[in-house]
Amino acid sequence: REVKGDVRIHGVCRIECKTTKHKSFSVTLDMIRKIEEAAISGGEMPAIVVEFNNGAGKKVAEVAIIPTYALDQLCTR
């Protein structure tokens, strides 16, 4: 069975990590559905983390994409 997600903290979260040297990165509905399906089946919070680098591997910025229900949980703590 294929396990989706590059990083998994059992029972907490499942993270799909992406890296690009470009100034933009497209997140597709398919990407969201795959990580969300895998995370929810394990009772975990899904996330996609995108790292932007300078082309030589040096990190310039990093952002996490999470569902709005997860953001709501974080904001109401």
Regions found by a protein language model. Name each.
Residues 1-77:
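Catalytic phosphate/metal-binding cores of nucleic-acid and nucleotide-processing enzymes, i.e., regions
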